[in-house]
């Protein structure tokens, strides 16, 4: 027995421990009872609170596991799936039950039985789909109930009837459907005054987000379209399967009505179960009383199953569907090749796609405006394209994408806007602003959108009068659009015909409102309406003309029609054509209505008293009447006819259009020329409403160059069609210019060619600077280009491209001519104002030569930039004016692109001309432009008598004539100025008269043509005379070119003569007073190595003369005396060579006889004779020049002026002159004879002789250093030895036989430095600068000759 008790205890104790284990795992807390605390505070009983959160319970623990006094039970955050009947029996003291955040899907009735004291119940955040009506039965003390965030969409009526103490209710759900099934709940809440916290409707969308307490019962209906809170189909994406596979489908939807059914469809056909095909369908069943589901299984899928499979939920309130596209692939699948599609929605590159698949691509431009394009999600904003089963691309859809062009997108947005009385005027103005870009329309939808908007705006035209004007302006803008775009819009949606019909309705509305007349106009469309009484009608004549309309402000239009030219009607109440007293008008068309127009209606009194509404509508061209189909009138054989006149529409409301007793005569102006003219009228009903041209009942009465008169027996749309050339444009009738223009222009071209060819062919021999040569050739070339383009291309208006090219070239050549004239004037001004050059410092390199390209950048670059910008802005600025008789720029662009720049350039040119005149008046001595001398020429010049700059020759009454060889330009500055100014003036006048000759009507054009011819002849003669005939070198070249014998003779003569030799061989020079003198040629001149005269002209090889020969030639190198007696010194031999120092006494020097520019105008009283040598020779290095000049300066202190080193005697004894002259003459003749005998056999003996040169102190005669003589080292106080005195005496005996000689040396042959640069010699006297004798630095007194 004891053993049995032990075993029983061993069995019972574990059971008690396990049964209490659940409760012991929960946390228990003591909680003071509120009722006990009030009744007996001292002896209060303790209540228990049990917390079983996060315990992973899958069901509610047994109530026995909880303490008896449990008043609060927390079972949140577990995995409880359902609440069974009697789950909380025994917890009669429980006041709070929290079961939130579990996965409860079902609650059985009686689950809360026994909880009589329960006051708060929280069932939120579960999966409760529905609640039974008796689920809360017995909870009489429940105060707060929370059912939020569950899956139920509705609550059964009477579910809260047993909750008599309920005060707070929460049942917010993302699936809550506020329909007729919740009407009872709204009424119950208001009756019981239940507090509902944050409970809002989720469906339908019309009530979404509204609080349940704010709804009225009548707003909760079941009439709205069916909206299911939950509707899912699996799979939801498109499927690609292979033949023979199995594919299951499942469909689930919220259960909202008892009669709900789930059905399956394929491509719109209901699918039934078919075991033979492997199709199985499970019956509908309700899950958790909130969802209805169905399953479809295809066990053996076949290619025929490809298509859209649809799950359809059918209820009495409506249907709802979900669709999946299925593609069944066979074993040999095909593919669509990659493709690129470009349209108004962008460019799309479709990839290689499997046959039967629909490919999707995102839109190129994302949606920027809400509510404009269908579909707001990114998935909907896609373009798709289907690849059919044959591997070919099939239908596509881009409608959900935005247009790429801004204009098209804005027009689409405007078209989608709803119009009303408040915004119609503003919308019409916006549309007018955007149609100003009509010339740039490239998409047919642009025109379609505008046509649709015009129709919408026309509905409000009766209310607002200004809308009619706006509609006319909008339609006028569309006439500037491309004809191809209008044709496509007409074919797509009858856009053009709809606009014309809308404009016709405007006129009728105006006259219907009681107005007797109405008119409006625009650049391309004119509208006129009249109320006509049949009894008083005597005929009418209406004329269409274009004129500036000051009444209305017209927006600027882009395109070929100028906004100033407005089309307008002028009507007279008579049938005859009256003279129009209208200024600055161009007649485009005229219409004559006969007096018998209303006779066909009979003579009844009612008909005679009737008032008819007549409206006239005129279009500048036929773009709004594009034929979309072929007709006999448009294509007759190989001919293709097009509208070549304005289109005029005439219509009388309520009046028959055909079979008039008297015809209507219409005169139309042709803007295009063609052949085979046909009168026609537009029939809106042809081609299935597309419209077309017909010619029945119309004939041509008269036709001339510009106008065609048509007679028709009907009231309709009138026009003339003609056969054009294959390019679709007019057959050009060439209208030549006046013969005077052609003949005189030809003469001008020949003159310009002669000047250009002469200067190019004789470029190296003509005496003109390089700059002037380039400027003259370019000036003549651009004048030639202007003349040629004007004569040959100004009237080439038949082709727009050719005409534009002519306008651009004429624009460029005109500006370039003016700029080259300015460049030439600037060059003359710089030469006139240029200062004399000084010796550069030794450390300063010579400036580099400036490129000639700078002139081309100005003369040609600026016009190219101006023309390029003008053409890039709008190429139609050139040669695109309608009916323009010549190829030139439009008026407004030409103001800023041509007339303004041309006027400014000419103004700058005139300022340069005036500045040159002022400078020449201030400095009359500046006449010529001289050559720049090289370094050797500057150091060896022997003929400079006064200051001579490299640029100017200062002219004075005593100046010597300038040799031609010293001139850089044969023309004087005044002559150059006259040439460029005269050319520019004649060119400008020629341009003006040419423009007037082609722009004016007869007979003014004849007058200006004659003036053009006279100026062309004058300009050609002026250019030839000034630049060719008036130049010695060019005359010589022309004379040589004319006669071959004479040319050969001239070459021989030129080779025998020295540059400035006279006819007898004497060399010409000038005195100080300007008297010409001669000096006979000495023996020294003819003893130059026994060479002939032609050899002396070679500029690169001179005669080798010894020092004695140079002395013998001194008779020819004596400089002339100045007018005031000041001596002019000779410094022809002033260079001292360091490398030839030993041989300097007898070294031969190579001299070349050539003229040198001299000017003997020294002022009296000057202490020194100054000279300004030019820039050093550019090919010498800086170091070479520096070392050379340094040695020269050093030896200038030490080198004596005689062989023995003795001091030369300064005073000149007059009684020794004759003896010295005789001795020196005999000596020179002997040495010349001896040199001729020995020059070819051996080297001159003087090359081997040398004499030691004693140095003298550097501070010797420091105060008498030689000054700045123009002869490079010549001093006023130069010393003369005996031989120098002889030469001076000899010069006296030959006062009129002076020769200007310049010695040029080879690189290793230098002259003798005979002047002391540091001052006069010891014990010498100063030379009187006012003496009248000619002082020269003499040669060596003694010459050693072997």
Swiss-Prot record:
Region (Disordered): 18-45, 1157-1188, 1202-1284
Principal cellular location given in the protein's record: membrane
UniProt note: phenotype after gene disruption: Morpholino knockdown of the protein exacerbated the convergence/ extension (C/E) phenotypes of other planar cell polarity (PCP) family member mutants (vangl2, scribbled).
Cystine pairs: 251-311, 698-712
Biased composition (Basic residues): 1173-1187, 1212-1226
Record domain GAIN-B: where: 563-728
Example of a GO cellular component annotation carried by this entry: external side of plasma membrane
Ranges: LRR repeats: 66-90, 91-114, 116-138, 139-162, 503-529, 574-600, 611-632
SUPFAM superfamilies documented for this protein: Hormone receptor domain, Immunoglobulin, L domain-like
Start and end residues of each Ig-like domain: 229-327
Regions crossing the membrane: 740-760, 774-794, 805-825, 855-875, 898-918, 978-998, 1006-1026
Extent of Gly residues compositional bias: 1266-1280
Keywords: Cell membrane, Developmental protein, Disulfide bond, G-protein coupled receptor, Immunoglobulin domain, Leucine-rich repeat, Membrane, Receptor, Repeat, Signal, Transducer, Transmembrane, Transmembrane helix
Domain LRRCT residue range list: 176-223
GO BP: cell surface receptor signaling pathway; convergent extension involved in gastrulation; motor neuron migration; regulation of Wnt signaling pathway, planar cell polarity pathway; Wnt signaling pathway, planar cell polarity pathway
Record-stated family: Belongs to the G-protein coupled receptor 2 family. Adhesion G-protein coupled receptor (ADGR) subfamily.
Assembly mode: Interacts (via PDZ-binding motif) with disheveled proteins; leading to the localization of dishevelled proteins to specific membrane subdomains.
Name of the protein this chain belongs to: Adhesion G protein-coupled receptor A3
Organism: Danio rerio
Gene, per the UniProt record: adgra3
């Amino acid at each position: 027995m004891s053993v049995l008790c032990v075993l029983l205890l061993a069995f019972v104790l574990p059971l008690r421990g396990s049964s209490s284990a659940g409760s012991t795992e929960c946390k228990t807390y003591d909680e003071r009872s509120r009722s006990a605390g009030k009744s007996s505070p001292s002896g209060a009983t303790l209540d228990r609170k049990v917390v079983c959160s996060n315990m992973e319970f899958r069901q509610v623990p047994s109530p026995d596991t909880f303490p008896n006094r449990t008043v609060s039970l927390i079972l949140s955050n577990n995995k409880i799936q359902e609440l069974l009947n009697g789950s909380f029996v025994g917890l009669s003291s429980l006041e709070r039950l929290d079961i939130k955040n579990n996965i409860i899907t079902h609650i059985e009735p009686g689950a809360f039985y026994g909880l009589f004291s329960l006051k708060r119940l929280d069932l939120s955040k579960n999966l409760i789909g529905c609640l039974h009506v008796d689920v809360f039965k017995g909870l009489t003390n429940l105060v707060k109930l929370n059912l939020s965030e569950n899956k139920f969409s509705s609550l059964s009526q009477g579910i809260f009837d047993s909750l008599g103490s309920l005060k707070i209710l929460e049942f917010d759900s993302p699936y809550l459907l506020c329909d007729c099934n919740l009407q009872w709940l709204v009424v119950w809440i208001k009756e019981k005054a239940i507090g509902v916290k944050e409970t809002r409707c989720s469906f339908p969308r019309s009530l979404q987000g509204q609080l349940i307490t704010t709804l009225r019962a009548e707003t909760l209906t079941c009439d709205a379209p069916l909206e299911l809170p939950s509707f899912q189909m699996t799979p939801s994406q498109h499927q690609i399967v292979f033949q023979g596979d199995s594919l299951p489908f499942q469909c689930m939807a919220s259960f909202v009505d008892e009669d709900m059914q789930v059905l399956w469809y394929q491509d719109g056909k209901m699918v039934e179960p078919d075991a033979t095909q492997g199709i199985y369908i499970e019956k509908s069943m309700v899950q958790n009383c909130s969802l209805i589901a169905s399953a479809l299984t295809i066990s053996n899928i076949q290619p025929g199953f490809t298509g859209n499979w649809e799950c359809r939920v059918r209820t009495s309130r409506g249907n709802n569907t979900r669709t999946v596209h299925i593609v069944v692939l066979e074993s040999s699948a095909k593919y669509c090749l990659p493709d690129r599609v470009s349209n108004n929605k962008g460019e799309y590159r479709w990839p290689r796609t499997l046959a039967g698949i629909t490919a999707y691509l995102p839109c190129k431009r994302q949606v920027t405006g809400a509510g404009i394009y269908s579909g707001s999600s990114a998935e909907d904003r896609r373009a798709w394209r289907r690849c059919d089963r044959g591997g070919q691309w099939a239908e596509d859809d881009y409608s959900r994408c935005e247009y790429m062009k801004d204009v098209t997108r804005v027009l689409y947005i405007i078209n989608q806007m709803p119009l009303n009385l408040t915004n119609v005027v503003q919308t019409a103005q916006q549309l007018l602003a955007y149609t100003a870009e009509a010339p740039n329309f490239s998409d047919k939808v642009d025109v379609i959108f505008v046509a649709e908007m015009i129709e919408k705006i026309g509905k409000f035209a009766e209310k607002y009068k200004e809308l009619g004007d706006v509609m006319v302006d909008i339609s006028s803008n569309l006439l500037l659009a491309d004809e191809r775009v209008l044709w496509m819009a007409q074919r797509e949606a009858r856009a053009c015909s709809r606009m014309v019909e809308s404009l016709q309705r405007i006129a009728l509305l105006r006259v219907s409102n009681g107005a007797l007349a109405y008119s409006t106009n625009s650049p391309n469309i004119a509208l006129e309406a009249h109320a006509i009484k049949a009894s008083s009608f005597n005929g009418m004549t209406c004329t269409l003309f274009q004129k500036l309309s000051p009444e209305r402000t017209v927006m600027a239009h882009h395109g070929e029609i100028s906004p100033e030219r407005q089309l307008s009607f002028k009507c007279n109440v008579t049938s005859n054509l009256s003279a129009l007293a209208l200024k600055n008008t161009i007649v485009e068309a005229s219409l004559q209505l006969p007096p018998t127009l209303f006779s066909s209606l009979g003579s009844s009194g009612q008909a005679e008293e009737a008032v008819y509404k007549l409206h006239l509508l005129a279009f500048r061209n036929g773009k709004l009447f594009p034929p979309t189909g072929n007709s006999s009138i448009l294509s007759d054989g190989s001919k293709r006819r097009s509208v070549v006149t304005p289109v005029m529409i005439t219509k009388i409301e309520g009046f028959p259009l055909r079979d008039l007793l008297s015809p209507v005569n219409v005169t139309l102006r042709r803007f295009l020329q063609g052949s085979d003219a046909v009168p026609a009228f537009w029939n809106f009903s042809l081609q299935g409403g597309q419209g077309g041209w017909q010619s029945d009942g119309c004939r041509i009465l008269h036709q001339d160059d510009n106008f065609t008169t048509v007679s028709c027996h009907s009231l309709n749309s009138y026009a003339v069609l003609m056969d054009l050339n294959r390019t679709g444009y007019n057959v050009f009738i060439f209208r030549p210019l006046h013969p005077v223009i052609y003949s005189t222009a030809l003469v001008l071209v020949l003159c310009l060619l002669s000047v250009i060819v002469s200067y190019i062919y004789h470029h190296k021999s003509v005496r003109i600077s390089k700059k002037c040569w380039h400027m003259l050739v370019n000036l003549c070339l651009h004048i030639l280009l202007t003349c040629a383009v004007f004569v040959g291309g100004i009237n080439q208006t038949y082709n727009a491209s050719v005409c534009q090219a002519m306008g651009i070239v004429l624009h460029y050549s005109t500006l370039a001519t003016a700029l080259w004239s300015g460049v030439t004037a600037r060059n003359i001004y710089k030469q006139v104002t240029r200062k004399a050059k000084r010796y550069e410092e030794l450390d300063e390199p010579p400036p580099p030569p400036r490129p000639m390209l700078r002139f081309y950048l100005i003369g040609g670059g600026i016009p190219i930039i101006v023309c390029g910008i003008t053409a890039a802005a709008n190429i139609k600025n050139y040669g695109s004016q309608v009916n323009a008789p010549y190829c030139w720029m439009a008026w407004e662009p030409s103001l800023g692109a041509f007339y303004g720049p041309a006027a400014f350039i000419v103004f700058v040119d005139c300022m340069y001309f005036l500045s040159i005149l002022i400078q020449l008046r201030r400095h009359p001595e500046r006449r010529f432009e001289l050559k720049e001398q090289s370094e050797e020429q500057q150091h060896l010049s022997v003929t400079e008598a006064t200051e001579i700059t490299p640029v100017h020759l200062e002219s004075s009454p005593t100046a010597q004539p300038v040799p031609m060889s010293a001139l850089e330009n044969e023309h004087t500055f005044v002559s150059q100025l006259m040439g460029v100014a005269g050319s520019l003036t004649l060119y400008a006048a020629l341009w003006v008269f040419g423009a007037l000759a082609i722009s004016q009507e007869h007979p003014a054009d004849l007058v200006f043509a004659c003036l053009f011819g006279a100026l062309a002849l004058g300009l050609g003669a002026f250019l030839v005379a000034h630049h060719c005939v008036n130049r010695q070198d060019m005359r010589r070249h022309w004379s040589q070119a004319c006669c071959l014998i004479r040319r050969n003779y001239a070459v021989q003569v030129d080779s025998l003569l020295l540059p400035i030799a006279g006819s007898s061989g004497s060399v010409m020079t000038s005195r100080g007073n300007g008297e010409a003198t001669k000096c006979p040629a000495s023996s020294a001149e003819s003893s130059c190595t026994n060479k002939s005269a032609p050899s002396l002209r070679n500029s690169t090889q001179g005669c080798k003369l010894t020092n004695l020969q140079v002395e013998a030639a001194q008779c020819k190198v004596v400089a002339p005396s100045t007018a005031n007696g000041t001596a002019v010194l000779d410094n022809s031999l002033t260079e001292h060579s360091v490398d030839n120092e030993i041989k300097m006494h007898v070294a031969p020097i190579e001299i070349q006889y050539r003229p040198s520019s001299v000017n003997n105008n020294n002022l009296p009283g000057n202490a020194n004779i100054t000279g300004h040598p030019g820039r050093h020779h550019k090919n010498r290095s800086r170091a070479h020049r520096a070392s050379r000049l340094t040695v020269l300066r050093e030896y200038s202190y030490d080198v004596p002026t005689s062989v023995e080193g003795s001091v030369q005697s300064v005073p000149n004894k007059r009684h020794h002159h004759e003896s010295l002259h005789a001795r020196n003459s005999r000596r020179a003749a002997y040495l010349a004879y001896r040199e001729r005998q020995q020059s070819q056999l051996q080297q001159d003996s003087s090359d081997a002789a040398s004499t030691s040169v004693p140095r003298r102190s550097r501070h010797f005669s420091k105060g008498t250093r030689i000054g700045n003589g123009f002869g490079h080292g010549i001093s006023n106080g130069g010393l003369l030895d005996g031989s120098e005195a002889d030469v001076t005496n000899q010069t006296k005996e030959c006062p009129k036989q002076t020769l200007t000689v310049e010695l040029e040396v080879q690189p290793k042959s230098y002259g003798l430095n005979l002047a002391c640069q540091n001052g006069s010699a010891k014990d010498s006297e100063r030379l009187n600068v006012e003496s009248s004798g000619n002082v020269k630095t003499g040669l060596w007194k003694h010459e050693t000759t072997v």
